[in-house]
């Protein structure tokens, strides 16, 4: 709510995804690791088990903007110029120079929305599964097991997600949450 900068989400669906044993593992990256930061935590377990895996950078990713050259990171990870679709563009006061990082310079308070970001990643996974398997019964929180996983402040994010209303999570694994 009120965030100026988006959080990233990513979904991986394994070739052996079982539509009859529907499973989504949703993970929040720890620290400022970006969207790929939780692959070793969630993907390494969930994908071989046939689960789809959804990730969020929880609004604290590694996106940066070079104030001096007016360049930043595109959504595909390559560098781009101001005016292109960049993952993060800060409000820059006149005369400022240096590099701005999304986590520190977005002007948002991403921690306030960590739980929502985890839930949105899970919702994105269900939407992706509905697009990938249009002939299947619709994927919903009621018919798909959802397990949230995170370590460090990624663990804190999944605990915040567990505090949200509704019965959308089936399990939470939080290692050393903060």
Model-derived segments and spans:
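Short helix-terminating capping/connector loops at secondary-structure junctions
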Residues: 18-21, 134-144, 167-168
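Hydrophobic or amphipathic alpha-helical targeting/insertion segments
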Residues: 24, 30-84
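Alpha/beta-hydrolase active-site loop
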Residues: 81-97, 102-137
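Short, hydrophobic alpha-helix immediately C-terminal to the catalytic nucleophile
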Residues: 119, 159-163
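Gly/Ala-rich beta-loop-alpha elbow adjacent to hydrolase catalytic centers
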Residues: 147-158
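Active-site nucleophile loop of the alpha/beta-hydrolase fold
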Residues: 173-178
